[in-house]
Amino acid sequence: MKRNHRNALLLVTLSACLGLPAEAADRMRAGQWEGTWTGGGRTRATSECVTQAQADAMNGDAGAVRAHLEKIIPAAICKVTNIKVSAGQIDYTSVCAGKENAITTIYHGDRFESTDSGGARSEAKRVGACK
C-alpha cells in the first residue's frame, strides 16, 4: 500500500509540474521537459512532452487547472483540491490513499521547482521541442 501511495503521489506531482502551463510567459511552455523527482529516499529522472494543447488547456484560471488535472489523474488515485493560481506559482492539495499533501510549484519560464508537504521535490527545465 505504501508503494502504491508513493506512485500515486509521484503521478500527481509530475502531472502538476509537467502539465500545468498557465500564463505562458511566466510559466511553462510547450516542449520537452527533463528533470528529477526525489521522494521516499529515491531519485528518478523525469522527461515529458508538454504539447501545445496541454499548454493551451492550462493557460487559464484555477478552474482550468483543476479540469486538466482531473482529466489526467484518475479520481480513483488522487483527488485534487484547493487549487490556487498566481503569475508564477501553483499551489494545490492532493488526497491520495487518504493522505493529504500540499504541493507548491514555482515557475521561472523554462524551468520550475516543486515541493510537497510529504518531503518530495522535483525540478525540471525545458530542453527544446518535444522528441
Residue ranges and their predicted role:
Residues S117-K131:
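Edge beta-strand at a domain terminus
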Residues T104-T105, R111-A120:
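Short, exposed beta-strand-loop hairpins at the edges of beta-sheets
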Residues L18-A24:
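Sec/Tat signal peptide C-region and signal peptidase I cleavage site
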Residues L11-V12, A22:
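Cleavable N-terminal signal peptides
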Residues K2-L10:
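Bacterial N-terminal signal peptides that target proteins for export
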Residues R44-T104:
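Central antiparallel beta-sheet cores of small beta-barrel/beta-sandwich binding domains
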Residues M28-T43:
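Tryptophan-anchored aromatic micro-motifs
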Residues E34-W37, D91-A97, E113-S117:
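Short beta-strand segments that buttress and anchor functional surface loops
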